[in-house]
Amino acid sequence: DITYENIVYGSTLAEKDKGKKTLPKVNKKPFTTELGNVTPFIIHPATWSSGEIKYQARKIVTAKLNNNGFNCIAAQVVVLPKDWKHASKLVSAIKKQLSIEKDRLAYYPKSTETLNTLKKAKHITQENDLSCATPHLTKDLELNDYFEQNEVWSSTLFFKYIEYSDELDFVEKSINYVNNQVWGNLGAAVLIKRHNNKKNKIYTDTYTAKLNYGTVAINEWPALGFIIPTMPWGGFPGNKDSDIQSGQGYVHNAYFFESPLKGVLYSKFKLPFVDPVWFTSNKKGTKVFKRLTYYQIDNSKLNLIKLIFSALI
């Protein structure tokens, strides 16, 4: 958003000028923008098995550490039901997964300095070994926390606890929180077990209808919406030039829907047998995507066979 403000207004806007309509522009040409997001993962309360807790932890960590967190849709805030019986177990599983992930290079300019500053902050924990080049950090969000309104753009994950009286109350309160207190509106994820059964469908429909995000992903990382060409990809409509947030306009939308509001992606709560190939915990990912690239270059049968075998063996 800072880059956008400098292009349109010639400088970074002061907080008091955010949202104003009458600010003078140095560049009046309209253009499409996609500017990132403080991506929330909403955890809907239910009874989860130990295996499901670990699986969802791997899913969340994948959404955090893909490209080492240098990603416009990287997971940043895990929104948890306070006093939910599995809350501490899920947080512990996320922290454990962060502790065993391989060390990645913090290659982005000034990211090392940002991480070193974060390491010195109060109540922040490094989950991986202190000798690692890139620390994997976690922290509980405080009231009006800076990182509710700013992308951390690194390997740092935050937890937010929402008080609730019942499931529907949590749905409404979590939606209100991410819509109004979390910066950006590019994409949001909701992890809800048995999302389409009779009992839960009303909750799922409420999430998809009321979350003001360009992509709402049920049981998946919103980034997967980007690789589906029929889905629109961009911020939720209505962002002002002087408060651009996740941007204006959209790409993809292969069906050419006029003025799409959002794309909604549904996935199974847990896939059987093995983790998906894009999970950081899937050890075959590098080989599979390498073979997929070769196959897409020439569509040869030989490379198709190699692709299949790389996924199976």
Show the residue positions of the predicted features.
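ALDH superfamily catalytic-core signature
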Residues: 2-145, 218, 298-312
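Conserved C-terminal structural/oligomerization subdomain of aldehyde/semialdehyde dehydrogenase
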Residues: 58-67, 79-81, 89-100, 135-313
